[in-house]
């Protein structure tokens, strides 16, 4: 009888403290979320947390207390100190993926390791490095177009799969000097499935870690997701070991610079660090680009006036596909606005990484936040907020022209590649890849949505989010262009 009473008193006293005495007590938000992290973890595991937080911001405003020790923001004023301060706000370890080999990759590393990784990888992702890769990227896009031409007459195609195949082959060539053969064999490499399963397992594993149930992971986590996680680690390690056997050979991949003499004073990457970074780069360099292309295509297909306008501009600009390259596509009027608007409505990574406010605290968006608080700017909620964008839920690329009724849009709220020293190192590669694939697709084909197979589905609205989007099939009818 005594133990249950003690438990009840503990729960009541904890709730009372967090509601009325905690340093974050004055921040708005639902009481249940402020008292326990259970609603947050429930949404995370179910894949609804991004939209849950959006609803909370719509109800409570630009800053919301979404857990006992966590604040969510949607304003650009909060983003700058959170992601660009020096010294930096460190990443929240409870929001990071567990390291399967003890070595964090570039996405999860602390300040010192991240800085070293970035310097070692810098040349591969520099403008010079990307120019050297243009021929390789173009060869995969050519193969994508050839495969689509050979298969489009048999019925509609799921473009989410085709985009994944193309971007996975490209990042495979860049990361390891050889493609994964998805387009060649027209089948999904097992690594793609393992990557997607691994990402989906992270929220569950983090929830167990938060309550110190790590040792029970084998019993509590879904076996299929654990197997995906194990296979992802195995595939990555095998690829890195295969590359290390040819460490002295120049293969035109990103490891050329990593395996060469490191910059002055920088220790070389260990094998474990190479494995962790390879896993991060393959994920970030394939899944995110494929996601953006899928979202962009959906938005164009459901807003046909913009699809027609962009298609006409592309075909007027290029008389033949052979003159389409990374430089000429940047000259197409409205192309970047279409991508920017797609990234606003459908950011490939809907949630920014959480940071910990260092002691004693910091002023964020005009209010004091105590040290130790976990904070983040939520991309999806920020980009869909009427406080940042006029007509926020509509696909209107001309808002990026910064005039007319959209002149007061807070475009800096949309940061799909993040900001600060930890912004996406592959931003230029991703943009070049997406521009080229989209332009080639609209140059070669007349496209329309297969509404029968889509069954009037709101493709974006039905997707769950486990760090990344759980994309559903996007059935598209492709016809070789008539003129």
UniProtKB/Swiss-Prot annotation:
Keywords: Heme, Iron, Metal-binding, Monooxygenase, Oxidoreductase, Virulence
A Gene Ontology molecular function term of the record: iron ion binding
Amino acids binding heme: 424
Cofactor: heme
Alphabetized Gene3D superfamilies for the sequence: Cytochrome P450
Induction statement: The genes forming the sterigmatocystin biosynthesis cluster are co-regulated and induced on oatmeal porridge or the fungal isolates were grown either on oatmeal porridge or in YEC medium (0.2% yeast extract, 5.0% corn steep liquor). Expression is positively regulated by the cluster-specific transcription factor aflR that binds the palindromic sequence 5'-TCG(N5)CGA-3'found in the promoter.
GO biological process, one term: sterigmatocystin biosynthetic process
Pathway the protein acts in: Mycotoxin biosynthesis; sterigmatocystin biosynthesis
E.C. designation(s): 1.14.-.-
InterPro entries per the UniProt record, alphabetical: Cyt_P450 (IPR001128), Cyt_P450_CS (IPR017972), Cyt_P450_E_grp-I (IPR002401), Cyt_P450_sf (IPR036396), Cytochrome_P450_monoxygenase (IPR050121)
Stated name of the protein: Cytochrome P450 monooxygenase stcF
Organism from which the protein derives: Emericella nidulans (strain FGSC A4 / ATCC 38163 / CBS 112.46 / NRRL 194 / M139) (Aspergillus nidulans)
């Amino acid at each position: 009888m005594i133990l249950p009473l003690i438990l009840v008193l503990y729960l009541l006293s904890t709730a009372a403290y967090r509601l009325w005495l905690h340093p974050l007590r004055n921040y708005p938000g639902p009481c249940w979320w402020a008292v326990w992290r259970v609603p947050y973890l429930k949404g995370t595991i179910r894949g609804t947390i991004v939209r849950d937080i959006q609803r909370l911001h719509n109800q409570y405003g630009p800053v919301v207390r979404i857990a006992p020790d966590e604040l969510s923001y949607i304003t650009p004023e909060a983003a700058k100190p959170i992601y660009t301060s020096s010294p930096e706000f460190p990443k929240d370890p409870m929001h990071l993926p567990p390291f399967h080999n003890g070595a964090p990759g570039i996405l999860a590393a602390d300040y010192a390791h991240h800085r070293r990784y970035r310097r070692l990888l810098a040349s591969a992702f520099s403008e010079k490095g990307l120019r050297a890769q243009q021929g390789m990227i173009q060869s995969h896009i050519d193969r994508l177009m050839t495969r689509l031409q050979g298969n489009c007459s048999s019925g509609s195609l799921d473009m989410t799969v085709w985009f994944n195949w193309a971007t996975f082959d490209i990042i495979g060539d860049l990361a390891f000097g050889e493609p994964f053969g998805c387009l060649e064999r027209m089948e999904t490499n097992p690594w793609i499935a393992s990557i997607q399963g691994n990402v989906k397992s992270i929220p569950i594993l983090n929830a167990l870690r938060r309550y110190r149930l790590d040792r029970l992971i084998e019993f509590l986590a879904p076996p299929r997701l654990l197997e995906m996680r194990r296979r992802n680690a195995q595939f990555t390690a095998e690829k890195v070991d295969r590359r290390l056997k040819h460490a002295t050979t120049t293969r035109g991949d990103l490891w050329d610079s990593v395996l060469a003499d490191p910059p002055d004073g920088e220790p070389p990457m260990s094998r474990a660090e190479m494995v962790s970074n390879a896993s991060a780069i393959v994920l970030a360099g394939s899944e995110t680009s494929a996601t953006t292309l899928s979202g962009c295509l959906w938005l164009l297909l459901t807003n046909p006036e913009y699809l027609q306008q962009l298609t006409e501009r592309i075909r007027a600009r290029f008389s033949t596909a052979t003159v389409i390259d990374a430089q000429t596509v940047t000259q197409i009027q409205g192309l970047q606005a279409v991508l920017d608007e797609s990234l606003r409505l459908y950011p490939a990574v809907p949630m920014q990484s959480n940071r910990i406010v260092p002691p004693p605290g910091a002023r964020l968006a005009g209010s004091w936040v105590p040290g130790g608080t976990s904070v983040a700017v939520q991309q999806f909620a920020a980009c869909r907020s009427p406080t940042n964008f006029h007509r926020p839920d509509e696909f209107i690329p001309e808002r990026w022209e910064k005039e007319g009724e959209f002149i007061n849009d807070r475009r800096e709220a949309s940061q799909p590649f993040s900001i600060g020293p930890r912004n996406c190192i592959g931003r230029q590669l991703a943009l070049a890849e997406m521009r080229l694939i989209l332009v080639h697709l609209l140059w070669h084909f007349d496209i329309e949505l297969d509404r029968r197979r889509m069954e009037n589905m709101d493709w974006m609205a039905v997707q769950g989010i486990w760090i990344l989007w759980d994309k559903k099939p996007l059935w598209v009818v492709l016809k070789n262009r008539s003129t």
